[in-house]
Amino acid sequence: MNMKSMKIKTLAVSLLTLGMTACSDSFLDTASKTESNTESFYKTQNDAKRALIGCYDGWRQTSSNPGIGFFVASEVMGAECFAGLGNTDARNYQVIDRFDIAQSSSDLNIYESDWARYYEGIYRCNELIKYEGQIAWDSDAAHKTCMGECHALRAILYFDLVRLFGNVPLLTVATQENVPQSPAADVYQVIFDDLQYAIDNIPADAYPKAKSSENDGRITKYAAEALYARAYLFYTGYYGASIESVTKEKALSYVEDVISSKEYDLVADYKNLWPAASAGIAKVGDAKTLLGTYAGDGNIETVLSMKYTNTQDYNGNNDSNRWQVMVGMRSLTAAPYGKGWGCMTVNPQFVNSYEANDKRKEASIIDIVNEGIAEAEGFEDSYGDWREYTGYCVKKYSPLCFADGTSAVKIDGSGGFQEQNHQDWVIVRYADVLLMAAELGSPKAQEYLDQVRSRAGLASVAATQANILKERKYEFAFEAINYWDLLRQGVDYAAKQIATSGIAVKSGGLDDKVVITEQNIKAKKGLCQIPQNQITLSNNILVQNDGWK
């Protein structure tokens, strides 16, 4: 990695995000009175709040900037979806789906943008932490809350990075050194330390759920506790290792604390968690019908979500859910489902594996034939241009459109379907907290599992580890969770679940097959390709992951 270039670039991005400009008067021995820089900025609590907004924005940029994105990568690598997209598109997503660079041998920098965005976000967090001591805080509570959120954001950014790439450069302070990768254990130590800091410092009542209209999207003590348990389960499962002071008992106590807080609950009807599953067919401007029975952003089940807006454009304003357009049906609208690029076509084997009468199936998956979409105007053109068409698409994050096909990214119909989607990415739900507590050995494991299954319309089953993990598979389908659940059960196990011997699909309207081998997944250990440009810029200090060399 070219750390010097990264530092300069990310500093500039950070200052711009905070509404500041850097000032350099090479011959005047005076400080700027009108502009802010790192020497003059970090002084007041308001400065700290603005810097924290920059940290949140740095996190959001990992989704709002063009790139693969953690969400899409997680789904394409997993067992639920294929890469899809257009029949004549480049095959870079097939490289990801099949863990096979031979699908597109020139695509050596698939994650270039993602790599940069994550380290830019980390840089912003590191800067606020660096200057924490020179800030005049108005209150101890405000100080602890702000810095707790900052540490949690850094933990989230590193948790994504280390899952995607394994050993990564570990930067907790700004540096111009050419830093090599750190062992994953060292990265996880920082992740757990940062989450522990957030748990210890963010007051439980800092962002009450009762005021979600004001607080939605903020990291709470409870979100940090849930993330701690998620990180514990993945680290101990994937690596088969432990870190001193990071224990199963502690992880369980944290998710039990989230439950006992009474801040959260399950939304009564599973489909109402997702806009497309609960939407009505509406005329342009009719928000009430469009939103239908949707429980709303920041609903009682949301523990943590990433927030977006619909103001993104092609002039550098990056604040939308940029990956949502990938989820939409290939250039096809069928109200309430809006169009997109046809990525993440759903594996029919996954569709057929649901238990009978599981309500989550219809809420999660668009069935193109049985919902009458195959008869819609424009379907034949879409079908003829679609790669790895299976007849099934992701419903949970499908874009929306009005009855006439106009994109619903803005209620007045004026928005752009490509760049202005803004559905929240729900990162932690209360259902996840319940199932993690059950998996970690809570005395109430059976009760927690039953709550989740009852909502899905299913009978009770014994709260065994196997049944809990199976439940997660369907509860969290298409939420960027299941791939990591597979990996933490062992790479060999994940490879066996993901591999396909040749599932029949249609590409360009013609017969095709998706072949994913266990060998490819095992060779890569389930990890992603480090961008070759970063390896070159580092003078080969960075080492490519096994299987991608």
Residue ranges and their predicted role:
Residues 24-91, 196-197, 218-381:
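An aromatic- and glycine-enriched ligand-binding surface/loop that stacks and positions planar moieties
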Residues 44-63, 88-165, 177-189, 195-210, ...:
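Conserved, well-structured interaction surfaces
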Residues 90-102, 107, 349-428:
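Flexible, polar/acidic helix-loop-strand segments at domain edges
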Residues 22-24, 118-119, 190-192, 215-216, ...:
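Long, intrinsically disordered, low-complexity segments
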Residues 162-164, 169, 206, 234-243, ...:
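Short coil/turn linking the two alpha-helices of tandem helical-hairpin repeats
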Residues 1-21:
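Sec-dependent bacterial lipoprotein signal peptides
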